[in-house]
């Protein structure tokens, strides 16, 4: 199976707790097409940890729990996984995980705090959009309010919240509302990190079929910059590191907000005013 991980977990020990995604219903996502979700046995996970620890007990500093939704793992057994990681890796600094909003909602704040005490320091959660109608259309499986509650719950437990949104997810017709409502939901969550990706169609997904049958029209590169600009312009954070450096994006950026908000908005505006597409990543270089 293909391994999916955030770019920031490139040097982490990748430890699968589940196979596939517990929701696996988003219309745009092809990561787990045809994969039946299952939770791995605790004893198999501990064997994986022991196998790596035999040679790397002192050098593993970061661990990333995968696949698509490791936080759904049963609390008692997840606690045992965390304890075993701490026993076997002497210099462990951080454990991270993917989390769906639903799995974050299932855990109580006290349960999340227990995981935080054991080293779960960051959770990566897909927000995608703040447009309630679009959340239904893409079959996200949660509402605007549930996503906000999930993000806030992670932060309340002391776990760093790193969320992703998808430029162009509403297509041309829904672009303006998607951007404005996404800025709103990001403001309401006030995450520590935001990663913006740009929509890329995956054959076999419902969204791809919508595109083929003319029900969905992709935005242009410059339209994606307008969305990016509006999201940054209309969202407010206590302190957030905002990136759009994923390989799907046309304009790679990394910026600390709110400190450099005006600077990054000017950069995007200059490209839009001058229609400087030469500064944008070419289609052939974009990948998921």
List the predicted regions and their residue ranges:
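Aromatic/hydrophobic pocket-lining residues that form the small-molecule binding cavity
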Residues: 45, 78, 108, 147, ...
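Auxiliary Fe-S-binding modules of radical SAM enzymes
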Residues: 2-9, 184-288
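Conserved SAM/AdoMet-binding glycine-rich loop
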Residues: 53-157, 236-237
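Catalytic cores of alpha/beta
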Residues: 110-112, 170-188
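Canonical Radical SAM [4Fe-4S] cluster-binding loop centered on the CxxxCxxC motif
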Residues: 4-44
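Conserved strand-turn element in the central/C-terminal portion of the radical SAM core barrel
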Residues: 102, 130-134, 154-178, 197-203, ...
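Hydrophobic faces of well-ordered beta-strands that scaffold small-molecule active sites
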Residues: 13-15, 63, 93-99, 123-125, ...
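Conserved, mostly hydrophobic/aromatic
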Residues: 21, 29, 45, 65, ...
């Amino acid at each position: 199976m293909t391994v999916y991980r955030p770019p920031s977990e490139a040097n982490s020990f990748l430890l699968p707790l589940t196979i596939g995604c517990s929701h696996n219903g988003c219309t745009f996502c092809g990561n787990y097409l045809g994969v039946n979700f299952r939770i791995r046995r605790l004893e198999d996970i501990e064997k994986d940890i022991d196998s790596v620890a035999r040679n790397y007990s002192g050098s593993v500093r970061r661990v990333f729990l995968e696949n698509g939704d490791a936080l759904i793992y049963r609390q008692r057994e997840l606690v045992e996984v965390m304890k075993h990681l701490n026993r076997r890796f002497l210099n462990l600094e951080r454990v991270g995980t993917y989390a769906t909003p639903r799995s974050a909602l299932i855990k109580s704040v006290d349960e999340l705090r227990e995981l935080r005490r054991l080293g779960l320091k960051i959770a990566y959660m897909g927000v995608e959009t703040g447009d309630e109608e679009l959340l239904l259309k893409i079959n996200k499986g949660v509402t605007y309010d549930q996503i906000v509650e999930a993000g806030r719950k992670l932060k309340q437990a002391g776990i760093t919240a790193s969320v992703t949104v998808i430029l162009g997810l509403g297509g041309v017709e829904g672009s303006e509302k998607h951007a404005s409502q996404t800025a709103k939901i990001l403001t309401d969550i006030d995450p520590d990190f935001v990663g913006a990706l740009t929509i890329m169609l995956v054959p076999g997904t419902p969204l791809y079929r919508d595109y083929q049958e003319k029900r969905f029209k992709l935005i242009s590169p410059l339209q994606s910059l307008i969305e990016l600009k509006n999201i940054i312009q209309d969202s407010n954070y206590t302190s957030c590191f905002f990136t759009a450096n994923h390989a799907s994006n046309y304009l790679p950026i990394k910026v600390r907000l709110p400190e450099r908000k005006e600077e990054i908005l000017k950069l995007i505006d200059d490209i839009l005013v001058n229609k400087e597409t030469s500064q944008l990543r070419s289609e052939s270089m974009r990948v998921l």
